[in-house]
């Protein structure tokens, strides 16, 4: 059942107030920090500051365990208005706006067309998720469970254990999940979660435009980035899901845009900038450095994979700042980067006893990390493991690269690498060289990253989805491509480059259309809100053809329409999501467990089992995401979570958890001595350990689930650990042998 109409209106008013206050705060802070920014660049800075204010505000509330409706509304609005007052009092009318070179109207139309198509194509999976639920593996494994847990606990202090895997996902940065948690609190529903990534996509496209803005090639840099952002792997993994790559990509591009525009602040009154600014000028003024640090912090607060390009670019900027300016550049950019992006790493360091990134020991430093069992979603092969295997290229890498980046993937990769190498080697612009080197370094690190070719040996089934880890370097390199001097000067050559990139975009996206007529009305409305209206109002305002009251009136109309349509969508989402998991889970997931637990409210559910339980666990949170779901494990030092290794231990943990229900598979691993004869010391018969206890009642038995049956038990009392029968099992590394 959907939340009441009154709670919906309260949530809408709260969200509108928060967005308005934080937007106002971002606007006036930008007027103070970078008064020279204008047009699209100013709007990008406004958005970046507003998002940073939101994320930091929620982190503060989460640290104080105050993520309640009232506190979120009052504190976020207060922070926004306080920031607006501070910016207004400090701005003082100082600083001259630097206008961008005027682009041709036809180039602007092409850029808007590409942006519209990209956003429109993203809306279809988003609307599908609003109808059926989010079924992406990472979404249901940890992204949405983290959001629901934070919303339920009203806190970011505690770790939420989702599995016993080596990755220790509960230490991942979680800014996207935190924003989703806030919307769950505001609306008493997670119905906005499938739409969140549609907010970050336009910010990423705007940032891509701004990368080329001072060179008069903004349309070309937008199109080049859109080739990657609208590629198959992005469409399959981002829109309509809680995966967070797009938020990181948006602010990584913003990081680059602020550095490039800040470096070229002394642009001529007309025409594009030259390759280098004044010889006696500092590399960057403090304002652009602050903005760059904020954007970099936001990117790093999303996903650890963004640390490579962020840190590489930051180090390069400091090095090239020159003697006598390096320390100033380091602290001016580094301080906001740490404030905005350091929260999750600080939390991890506190929980582990000193390690901000617990997935690694940092080599000789040997920092503490959780002692996880050596279990992975798939065998952890990297691309480098198959680097000389021609068969893998032919059967896996080449076909999946085509699925990920379209039929022109060889051309796209060649263009990206060539642009990055050329700019790193030949450009006289230090900032461009730093970004180019960072993009190449990110690609190299991707090749060596575990799980980029995950799967059984000789069968890297995880290669396609994990090409996402190549995307940060690829999108940076593609955005730099139109800045290479041989293809942007003179203007005629820049125009040819734009047309060529538009052709590549068209071939890439038109070969795999994902348009559904039943969603066209929603697509038109979302594209209107996210692309057409902002672009039209901004363009009209910059050319003086529309007054501010008219812009405000247009915004009010769109907001009112969104509120009306939103209620209908919220009700439909409550009635339909996760009701029919068959088209998505097929025979590979806990379908009957989904159907049963969707009817439960405010129940404590313990889960244990193999992959289908781990990766599908968000479906057990119930229709209103009110069930408290956690993986039943043995908590250890430094934030570890390990499998129980005996019947008595499992029953004791169930008693400690005070669960109302249990959801489990037959074994904790899909292969092992109990069913395949393969040696696997981590395959435990958890169903057999529990089923005979009179304190549990079997309510769901799904023998058709694959690769092994799933079960739901209702817990009616305390289980008896002493009643477990003696058994002899394979010895578990790191555990005492049990007879």
Predicted regions and their residues:
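Membrane-lumen/periplasm interface segments of specific transmembrane helices
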Residues: 319, 327-415, 559-567
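Transmembrane-helix signature of polytopic, membrane-embedded enzymes
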Residues: 36-46, 191-192, 208-231, 249-250, ...
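Hydrophobic, aromatic-rich transmembrane alpha-helices
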Residues: 203-204, 208-209, 318, 391-443, ...
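Membrane-interface helix-loop-helix junctions at transmembrane boundaries of multi-pass membrane enzymes
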Residues: 97-105, 213-221, 269-287, 321-332, ...
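Membrane-proximal, lumen/periplasm-facing interface regions of secretory-pathway glyco-
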Residues: 126-138, 165, 458, 514-524, ...
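Membrane-embedded, hydrophobic transmembrane alpha-helices
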Residues: 1-101, 106, 487, 494-529, ...
């Amino acid at each position: 059942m959907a939340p009441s109409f009154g709670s919906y209106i309260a949530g809408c008013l709260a969200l509108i107030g928060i967005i308005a206050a934080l937007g106002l705060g971002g606007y006036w802070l930008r007027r103070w920090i970078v008064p020279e920014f204008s047009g699209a660049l100013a709007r990008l800075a406004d958005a970046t500051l507003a998002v940073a204010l939101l994320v930091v505000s929620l982190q503060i509330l989460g640290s104080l365990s105050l993520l309640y409706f009232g506190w979120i509304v009052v504190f976020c609005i207060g922070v926004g208005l306080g920031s607006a007052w501070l910016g207004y009092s400090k701005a003082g009318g100082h600083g001259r706006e630097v206008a961008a070179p005027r682009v041709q109207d036809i180039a602007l139309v092409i850029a808007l067309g590409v942006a519209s198509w990209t956003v429109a194509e993203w809306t279809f999976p988003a609307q599908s998720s609003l109808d059926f639920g989010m079924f992406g593996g990472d979404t249901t494994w940890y992204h949405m469970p983290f959001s629901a847990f934070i919303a339920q606990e009203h806190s970011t202090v505690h770790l939420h254990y989702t599995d016993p895997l080596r990755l220790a996902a509960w230490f991942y940065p979680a800014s996207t999940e935190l924003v989703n948690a806030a919307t769950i609190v505001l609306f008493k529903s997670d119905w906005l979660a499938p739409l969140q990534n549609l907010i970050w996509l336009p910010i990423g496209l705007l940032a891509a435009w701004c990368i080329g803005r001072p060179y008069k090639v903004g349309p070309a840099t937008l199109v080049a980035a859109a080739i990657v952002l609208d590629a198959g792997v992005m469409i399959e993994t981002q829109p309509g899901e809680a995966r967070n790559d797009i938020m990181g990509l948006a602010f990584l591009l913003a990081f680059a845009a602020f550095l490039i525009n800040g470096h070229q602040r002394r642009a001529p009154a007309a025409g594009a900038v030259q390759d280098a600014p004044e010889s006696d000028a500092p590399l960057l003024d403090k304002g652009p450095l602050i903005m760059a640090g904020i954007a970099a912090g936001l990117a790093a607060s999303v996903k650890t994979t963004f640390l490579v390009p962020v840190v590489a670019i930051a180090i390069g900027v400091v090095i090239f700042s020159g003697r006598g300016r390096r320390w100033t550049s380091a602290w001016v950019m580094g301080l906001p980067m740490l404030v905005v992006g350091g929260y999750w790493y600080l939390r991890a360091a506190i929980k582990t006893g000193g390690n901000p990134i617990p997935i690694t020991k940092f080599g000789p430093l040997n920092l503490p990390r959780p002692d996880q069992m050596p279990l992975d979603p798939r065998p952890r092969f990297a691309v480098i493991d198959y680097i000389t295997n021609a068969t893998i290229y032919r059967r896996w890498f080449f076909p999946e690269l085509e699925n990920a980046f379209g039929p022109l993937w060889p051309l796209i990769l060649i263009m990206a690498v060539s642009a990055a190498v050329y700019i790193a080697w030949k450009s006289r612009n230090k900032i461009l060289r730093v970004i180019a080197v960072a993009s190449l370094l990110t690609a190299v690190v991707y090749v060596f990253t575990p799980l980029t070719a995950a799967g059984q040996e000789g069968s890297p089934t995880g290669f396609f989805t994990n090409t996402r880890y190549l995307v940060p370097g690829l999108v940076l390199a593609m955005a730099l491509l139109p800045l290479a001097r041989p293809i942007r000067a003179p203007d005629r050559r820049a125009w040819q480059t734009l047309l060529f990139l538009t052709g590549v975009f068209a071939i890439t996206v038109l070969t795999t259309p994902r348009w559904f007529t039943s969603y066209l009305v929603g697509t038109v409305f979302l594209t209107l809100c996210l692309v057409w209206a902002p672009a039209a109002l901004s363009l009209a305002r910059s050319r003086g053809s529309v007054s501010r009251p008219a812009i405000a009136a247009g915004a009010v109309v769109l907001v009112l329409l969104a509120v009306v349509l939103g209620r209908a969508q919220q009700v439909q989402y409550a009635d339909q999501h996760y009701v029919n998991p068959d088209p998505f889970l097929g025979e590979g997931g806990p379908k009957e467990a989904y159907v049963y637990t969707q009817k439960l409210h405010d129940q404590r559910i313990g889960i244990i089992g193999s992959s289908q339980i781990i990766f599908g666990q968000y479906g057990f949170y119930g229709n209103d995401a009110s069930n408290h779901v956690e993986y039943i494990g043995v908590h250890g030092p430094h934030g570890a979570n390990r499998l129980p290794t005996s019947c008595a231990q499992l029953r004791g943990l169930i008693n400690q958890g005070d669960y109302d229900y249990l959801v489990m598979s037959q074994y904790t691993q899909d292969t092992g001595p109990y069913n395949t004869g393969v040696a696997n010391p981590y395959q435990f018969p958890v169903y057999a350990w529990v089923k005979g206890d009179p304190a549990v009642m079997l309510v769901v038995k799904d023998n058709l689930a694959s690769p092994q049956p799933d079960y739901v038990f209702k817990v009616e009392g305390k289980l008896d650990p002493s009643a477990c029968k003696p058994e002899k099992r394979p010895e578990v590394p790191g555990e005492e042998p049990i007879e």
